[in-house]
């Protein structure tokens, strides 16, 4: 990667495009999902499209994750260590999954992650995309060109540093994973069971999203006419933003050991997460009340 970045003509631009494109891919997938969620599009007999979209979003994050890990920077090493500990924490089959995904040595790891990043996961994504939006792959060419152009410009204007190379003999510096993984990282830093915080909570959230079309029994599509569904969406968005921020936060007190600087107070953390539930529902009620009042006055 360093050779491509420093020696290949325009290699730095190619890498910048690749990096910004991967971040845009994850961000746009999340925004698209919540747009469909709040607009109730999944109610138009689109349950299969919604479920494939949720799965496609998860695979998109995995694709981005495997991509930035093959750089072998300090940030990549942290992400690889988290992945190894999470897969190992799975009861019974954990070690087997870890060995299958990460291999048993450096060369084996490189081969497996490159295969996942450039072959296995893209094939899965293409299959899901063919089911999820076959028509839009043809008719949304202008939008594809616009987003592609924006990424090309962004890659030229905002260069991305490779970061510090991971050295096994040198203690790593203070770093965090990419932004789309810092939420899970925040849960793990509460020092509760890794399987529960790093795998079970995200899995329950994904299952809840998959089941939304079958649980939403409201007849109308507007967010104002689906208060419980809207409240769940707003609360989940608030919790995602809070956990993402917390994943980036590291205590500025350099006088204490690094491990202690990374610890997040579980009582404060989970207390905040629980507090966001009534706040999310209260905010939803206020929004619906104001929207209905504005509609009444307009008539």
Label every model-predicted segment:
Residues 1-19, 24, 29-299:
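Membrane-embedded and interfacial regions of multi-pass energy-transducing membrane proteins
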């Amino acid at each position: 990667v360093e050779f491509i970045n420093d020696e290949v003509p325009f290699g730095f631009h190619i890498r910048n495009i690749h990096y910004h494109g991967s971040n845009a891919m994850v961000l746009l997938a999340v925004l698209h999902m919540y747009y469909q969620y709040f607009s109730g599009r999944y109610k138009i007999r689109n349950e299969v499209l919604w479920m494939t979209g949720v799965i496609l979003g998860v695979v998109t994050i995995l694709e981005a994750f495997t991509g930035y890990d093959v750089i072998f920077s300090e940030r990549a090493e942290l992400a690889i260590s988290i992945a190894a500990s999470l897969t190992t924490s799975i009861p019974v089959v954990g070690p087997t999954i870890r060995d299958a995904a990460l291999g048993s040595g450096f060369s084996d790891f490189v081969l497996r992650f490159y295969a996942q990043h450039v072959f296995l996961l893209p094939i899965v994504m293409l299959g899901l995309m063919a089911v999820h939006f076959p028509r839009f792959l043809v008719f949304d060419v202008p939008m594809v060109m616009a987003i592609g152009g924006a990424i090309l410009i962004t890659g030229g204007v905002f260069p991305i540093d490779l970061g510090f190379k991971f050295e096994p003999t040198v203690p790593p510096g203070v770093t965090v994973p990419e932004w789309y993984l810092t939420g899970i990282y925040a849960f793990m830093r509460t020092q509760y069971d890794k399987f529960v915080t790093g795998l079970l909570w995200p899995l329950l959230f994904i299952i809840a999203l998959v089941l939304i079309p079958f649980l939403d029994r409201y007849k109308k599509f507007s967010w104002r006419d689906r208060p419980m569904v809207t409240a769940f969406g707003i609360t989940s968005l608030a919790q995602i933003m809070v956990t993402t921020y917390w994943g980036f936060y590291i205590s500025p007190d350099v006088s204490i050991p690094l491990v202690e600087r990374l610890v997040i107070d579980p009582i404060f953390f989970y207390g905040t997460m629980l507090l966001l539930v009534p706040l999310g529902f209260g905010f939803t009620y206020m929004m619906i009340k104001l929207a209905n009042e504005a509609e009444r006055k307009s008539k």
